[in-house]
Amino acid sequence: MKRSFPLVLFLLASACASAPPRPAEPVHVVIVGTTDVHGWFNGHIETPPGGGAGVVWGGLPALASYVEAIRKENDGRVVLVDSGDMFQGTLESNMFEGEAVVRGYNILGYHAAAVGNHEFDFGPVGPDAIVRNPGDDELGALKRNAGLANFPFLSANMVEKATGKTPAWAKRYTIVRSGAAKIGIIGLSTPDTPNVTMGANVISLDFTDPVAATIAAAKELRAQGVDAIVVAAHIGGRCTKTDDPHSLESCDRQQEAVHLLEELPPGTIDAFFAGHSHSQMRHYINGIPTAQGLAYSREFSTIDLWVDVDNDKVVKSDIRPPTMICSFVYEGTDQCDPRSAPANAKLIPRAFLGNTMSPDARVAATVDPFLRRVAAKRDEKLGVSTTAVLKRGYSGESPLGNVIADAIREASGADIAVMNSGGIRSDLPAGELTYGDIFAVSPFDNYPAVVIMNAAQIAEMLRATTSGNRGILQVSGIRYTVDAAKDADKDPAVRNRVTSITLPDGSPLDPQKLYSVVMPDFIAAGGDGMADLMKSIPPDRVQIFYARPIRDTLVDVLKKWNRPLSPAVEGRITMLNLEPAK
């Protein structure tokens, strides 16, 4: 024993010498979050409504310069997360099924990303958005992207129906080191995923209660000794003001994220990055710092955590205002939103944390080849023009919705056309149109489907899409009226806000007649809450036309019309008692 004692002392001394020093003060860790990039790895060129200097807003090369500045400011103690819907939405991303975004994220150094509903949109690897050939894997494109990523795809509430376990290509959570702090990151997906993606692509998966999934994952992470837990969730909220993080007055308390956070026991998590709703959040909800920036790579969110690593807890937090992603700003504003630009304002370089922002060369070199490969198709002129911007709309009739509904109705020869507002992703700009303009409006690989329906089924379709927050159906061949105050106290499953449905001449639908209704195959497959209705319709009354996707059908009809498009709202949809935005 005497002879072994010096050896014990030596081993103890060696262990102490090799262990990292424990900081006397809390460790400051900065969490940076993006969400709903939707394939916009390149910036948007936008101009003020009244004319003037255009600005490039967003893009991964510009984002990289901000992230690097924050890393420099905080000695590298930065955790970078994304809250989902990374890939779907632009020609340059969709043509390569999201690969450009993954490769850009790899260079940026993301630590984790939540699985959003639109991650499933591409279906199998290749041009088909759903399985059409024996041996195709409906999750093939997503699995490929997960394999390319240097960071995990996370969802604690997504399980395989066959096993009840998380798919092999994803994880429930991950743990990263940031300085001396050990940070757990949980991912969540919206439980509504089967209704807001192509349902056939998630037929093997279940999306469970996110509250229970968060509590279970957090318990496991605490047992593994993490100092803080961050959630990246494709679950969102809506707040119209972000100036006072402690006031929820401007927030919709019925939104998914608010409900989830208010259900969590105290101390379950330490920070929450929301997504899915394309709106800003900067609020403490149930004591939890919660952040969400604008979609399409226009903003990022930041939460600062001060971590007591000796006691595995967060002792202080702060939510910074959402930060616009741009290398130039309008003088006197420190922002690049052209809607708020002063008249004739000039652009100046953006200063951030003492650094001048400019696109990161490494990220640009990674994504630029994808842009070059689609440039010719994107810039292809269609020989069609608009006299003014054709606006989309979510809660009422829109000029662009009318054009699309008219186009697919004419192309199909159907009696009636409906188009989900959520499938119209951009306004149509004024002037001569390109294929890229049409793609921005209709990026999803949806095809026209003609469904034979009776009057009661048409009424149920309109009822279901006006009973909640999904966005109403744009129409051609019918008119309808919605009273937003009607049945407010009823559950959305039975709420009926539709007060009238007529043909364009004002006559009612014939209850004994069958009508042909053209719609995106997404709706025909049960999307946007249509599952129960579509199951009630015999399969031989549904025909999907795979020859041309809706965007190319739109191009064909616009060329056939051969006339300038002018915005027009014609009274197809009448909205009563619609509350103005706060």
Predicted segments — roles?
Residues A17-A19:
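Bacterial signal peptide processing site
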Residues A13-A15:
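C-terminal motif of bacterial Sec signal peptides marking the signal peptidase cleavage site
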Residues A24-T34, G39-K72, I107, V196-V211, ...:
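Catalytic centers of hydrolytic enzymes
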Residues P26-V30, N74-V79, L108-H111, L148-F153, ...:
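Loop/turn elements at helix/coil->beta-strand transitions in domains of secreted/extracellular proteins
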Residues D36, L63, D85, A113, ...:
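Divalent metal-coordination and catalytic microenvironments
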